[in-house]
Regions:
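Switch I (G2) and immediately adjacent beta-strands of P-loop GTPase domains
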Residues: 114-118, 310-337
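Generic enzyme active-site microenvironment
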Residues: 328, 362, 387
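Positively charged N-terminal leader segments that act as targeting/secretion signals
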Residues: 24-37
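Inter-motif core of Ras-like GTPase G domains
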Residues: 344-365
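Hydrophobic alpha-helical signal peptides and transmembrane signal-/tail-anchor segments
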Residues: 1-18
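Intrinsic-disorder-associated, low-complexity terminal segments enriched in Asp/Asn/His/Tyr and depleted
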Residues: 13-21, 26, 43-44
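C-terminal-of-GTPase-core extension/linker across diverse P-loop GTPases
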Residues: 55, 60-72, 199-320, 337, ...
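A glycine-rich (often HGG/GG-containing) alpha/beta subdomain
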Residues: 12, 42-203, 207, 211, ...
Length: 519
């Protein structure tokens, strides 16, 4: 590896002096590129300011790129985003006021027209951002044009025909990463924000974008590096401790383990806020499932009728359960029927409950508990929130009798019993809380200040936690200090994978290929 690195640097120096194209140099040195004058080193290469494996051969640093950054749908405005070396100069060639654009300071806006030869394409406002004070760390421009898809594409086509290349997925954010404008936790948070379904999901991703996870990882790394430094001093200048366990203070390592454990435990809860949960509404016919479905959605999606068997197929929709994204299913009522279509719907209901994270089982409080209810609940495979519906039409004595009857059945899968009125909207807060309590049981701190944002991050934190734990075991067993040092160095490298200071090229490709074009 050192030979390859040395050879790559020689190639870079040789071809750079010849003003050789970086893309061609990429091919010659086997995909390894040294990026000139970058302040952040994703691979922690100390012999140059920045060295990165490009995750996609089409990702060429500094090459002028452009992409539509807004949805291709009728709108008041559309934006075409551009970045790269010379992008302002290139844009000036198709701009009606080239001198004003070339002289524009960073964080300024210039009015004019995009032109194709002598033809005016659209009246635009151009936002100018100068390196390094831009999202990518390069010179950037954003062309704000009228938002019709035809107009936006026409503006982009003019740019593509005048020196710009179509940006790849995530290429703008990738350039921000290699130019030190964002670590990997922030880059991944950008995509999380785009994909967030609720305000709480967005808030958690914004926290990572603001740097709370990076700061937590940096704090843990400092604990490890401080301990590592003290051990290395002991190796160089040994004293007379009887055992290795006595030769250094392990309090920082124990604190690192505590904080790594909290981070590791946070992922299951954070994953729920990203991916959402599957919640299935079921119960006997006319229990009020469709009414509850419509009430939660705040729209009439499901047909509501007093006629039994109205719902024969299932409906689904994403909803906000107190900040948690939930994929909610309304299903056919459970009953024995000779109607072939309805019977198929009942079978689909049972299949959906097998894949659910939580079952919301509705029972009409005025009708009470039936043998069919009990039989279904005893066979349930997933946790159940049992909902007595129509409490607005159920007197207190009957409600108490119903609750006692349910408790006497002692059904294992029922985790919560609540009372609601789908018609009046009563008990919805308790309903959301019950579902969340079940889902977050055993997931660590639901309100973690710095939670993990991806499975990749969790894997790296798990490895770091294992290495730190092993270092303490090694010290307790009186292994050589070099063994402890190796464990701590491994842990620091694993944490570097979280932030991107140590990351393989295939990992980068996996991360940035998930982004939309223009981000």
């Amino acid at each position: 590896m050192r030979f390859l690195l040395f050879f790559s640097i020689l190639c870079y120096d040789f071809f750079y002096r010849l003003d050789f194209n970086l893309a061609e140099m990429n091919k010659i040195v086997g995909g390894f590129a040294i990026c000139k004058e970058l302040g952040f080193c994703p691979y922690n290469l100390k012999i140059c300011k920045s060295g990165v494996f490009m995750p996609d051969p089409k990702y060429v640093p500094e090459e002028p790129i452009c992409a539509v950054a807004t949805a291709l749908a009728p709108a008041a405005l559309g934006i075409v985003r551009c970045t790269g070396k010379g992008c302002v100069s290139l844009l000036s060639k198709v701009f009606s006021r080239p001198a004003a654009l070339l002289q524009a300071a960073g964080n300024s806006i210039v009015y004019g027209w995009i032109k194709n030869g002598g033809a005016k394409i659209d009246e635009v406002m151009v936002s100018v951002f100068r390196a390094p004070k831009s999202f990518t760390g390069e010179d950037m421009v954003e062309v704000s044009c009228h938002g019709g898809p035809g107009v936006v594409m026409a503006v982009q086509n003019v740019l593509l025909n005048n020196g710009f290349r179509q940006a790849e997925r995530g290429e703008f954010t990738f350039r921000a990463f290699i130019n030190g404008k964002a670590d990997l936790t922030k880059a991944e948070a950008v995509q999380e924000i785009i994909e967030s379904r609720t305000g709480e999901s967005r808030s958690r991703a914004v926290g990572r974008l603001a740097g709370n996870l990076f700061e937590e990882i940096s704090g843990i790394k400092k604990l490890l590096t401080d301990t590592l430094a003290s051990i290395e001093v002991e190796i160089e200048y040994p004293e007379d401790e009887e055992t290795i366990a006595d030769s250094f203070d392990r309090s920082d390592l124990q604190e690192a383990i505590r904080r790594l454990s909290e981070l590791n435990d946070s992922w299951q809860g954070e994953k729920l806020y990203q991916d959402g949960a599957r919640v299935v509404l079921c119960g006997r016919t006319n229990a009020g499932k469709s009414s509850l479905f419509n009430a939660i959605l705040k729209e009439d999606r499901a047909i509501v009728s007093d006629i039994e068997g109205t719902t024969r197929d299932w409906l689904e929709s994403w909803v906000d359960f107190g900040g948690l994204p939930v994929r909610l299913f309304d299903t056919a009522g459970l009953r024995e029927t000779e109607d072939v279509i309805e019977a198929h719907g009942v079978e689909l209901t049972k299949n959906l409950t097998e894949d659910a994270d939580v079952i919301l089982y509705l029972c009409d409080g005025a009708s009470g508990l039936s043998k069919d209810d009990v039989d279904f609940l005893r066979n349930a495979e997933k946790p159940v929130v049992f909902c007595w519906n129509k409490i607005d039409a159920t007197d207190a004595a009957l409600a108490e009798k119903n609750s006692l009857a349910l408790k006497n059945e002692n059904i294992e899968k029922i985790k919560k019993e609540i009372k609601i009125s789908a018609k009046k909207g009563n008990g919805f807060s308790e309903l959301y809380g019950a579902v969340k309590e079940i889902l977050f049981s055993g997931t660590g701190n639901e309100r973690a200040q710095a939670g993990l944002g991806s499975a990749r991050q969790k894997l790296a934190v798990e490895e770091a936690l294992e290495s730190v734990s092993h270092s303490i075991v090694a010290a307790d067993k009186d292994f050589a200090l070099d063994a402890v040092v190796q464990d701590l160095e491994d842990a620091i490298d694993f944490l570097g994978e979280v932030t991107g200071e140590v990351t393989a090229d295939d990992v980068l490709e996996s991360i940035f290929s998930r982004f939309c074009v223009g981000k």
